[in-house]
Amino acid sequence: MKIGVFVPIGNNGWLISTTAPQYMPTFELNKAIVQKAEHYHFDFALSMIKLRGFGGKTEFWDHNLESFTLMAGLAAVTSRIQIYATAATLTLPPAIVARMASTIDSISGGRFGVNLVTGWQKPEYDQMGIWPGDEYFSRRYDYLTEYVQVLRDLWGTGKSDFKGDYFTMNDCRVSPQPSTPMKVICAGQSDAGMAFSAQHADFNFCFGKGVNTPAAFAPTAARMKDAAEKTGRDVGSYVLFMVIADETDEAARAKWEHYKAGADEDALSWLTEQSQKDTRSGADTNVRQMADPTSAVNINMGTLVGSYASVAKMLDEVASVPGAEGVLLTFDDFLQGVETFGERIQPLMECRSHIPAVTREVA
């Protein structure tokens, strides 16, 4: 099973809490995280894009770096780990993304790929005057289908004359082209999102579900597997989890309860309000899960809380789910979390037994 790190491009990572670690996103922080991840044989690093945060006492995600420029910098200071940036497709023409991706492919020596997102939080785009109207919610995957076709044309042949409802290319050129086939990833959980990923993505991200229920996402992976089979393609699921680990189950649980007790209610109210704007995509979208009050303090990603051995066992259970090809991990404390994972958790995982033992890196 592949292991990735979801780097904290926004302040405070993925814990919407006054009692969680408070920090700003910087290049130096993300450089240290990704270099540690590479040292411990993580397979990939991904950054999201967020253009407006949730406010509240913690100013959650009000402070964010930009994904492509961050990952270009990280590509230059790593040598093995795969690097993925996220394109907010309403803000960037596909020909520009194609050229930026080709540039980072050159920087990384063929280790780069692109995560495509349609956009769900209206204020991110309204603040710039580029929100296309609420009808966009129902046609966003039509838009993204044309977008990815332009990308594939330009990466594949260096030229596009695509004509569609949203994009018109007139002998559009991009050169040099990527040195290796460019990976495209998505995070669809609605029926429309999964149908898009089945047709166009190399793999699909989905949320884990619940606390210490590592296989609860299995129905989502099964839906993705079924959708891919209809297209004759193999599109695996990569599952998002937060790891909160300690020497004992009790110590890890105490951390988790401490973070929940400090939940930033004002920021969570903003998330809930925004999640209700899309009335056209169904009840199974990522953003609806994010806002579920069950575990909104970490946007309801799957959460693995326990001793190092307990977390290792739960990750092996994830690996046993049909269609699950990888996990994307976040941590309450990223620098310590990546190191602890590499030294204390990964060596106990059967699905990572092929990874050589690694000692702590020398500063």
Curated annotation (Swiss-Prot):
In the Enzyme Commission scheme, what number(s) does this protein have?
1.14.99.46
Catalytic activity annotation: uracil + FMNH2 + NADH + O2 = (Z)-3-ureidoacrylate + FMN + NAD(+) + H2O + H(+); thymine + FMNH2 + NADH + O2 = (Z)-2-methylureidoacrylate + FMN + NAD(+) + H2O + H(+)
* Annotated residues for binding of FMN: 49-50, 115, 124, 140-141, 190
* Endoplasmic reticulum as UniProt keyword: no
Which Pfam families does the record associate with it?
A: Bac_luciferase
GO process annotations (BP): alkanesulfonate catabolic process; nitrogen utilization; uracil catabolic process
Does this entry carry the keyword Flavoprotein?
Answer: yes
Write the record's keywords in alphabetical order, separated by commas. Answer: Flavoprotein, FMN, Monooxygenase, NADP, Oxidoreductase
Gene3D superfamilies given in the database record: Luciferase-like domain
What is the uppermost EC class here?
oxidoreductase
Determine the domain of life of the protein's source: Bacteria
The record, for InterPro entries, names: Luciferase-like_dom, Luciferase-like_sf, Pyrimidine_monooxygenase_RutA, SsuD_RutA_monooxygenase
Give the GO molecular function terms.
Answer: alkanesulfonate monooxygenase activity; uracil oxygenase activity
Query: Which family is it part of?
Result: Belongs to the NtaA/SnaA/DszA monooxygenase family. RutA subfamily.
Protein role: The FMN-N(5)-oxide reacts spontaneously with NADH to produce FMN. Requires the flavin reductase RutF to regenerate FMN in vivo.
Q: Which PANTHER family match?
A: ALKANESULFONATE MONOOXYGENASE, ALKANESULFONATE MONOOXYGENASE-RELATED
Can you say what this protein is called? Pyrimidine monooxygenase RutA
User: Which species is listed as the source?
Assistant: Enterobacter sp. (strain 638)
> Lineage of the source organism?
Bacteria, Pseudomonadati, Pseudomonadota, Gammaproteobacteria, Enterobacterales
The gene from which this protein is expressed is rutA
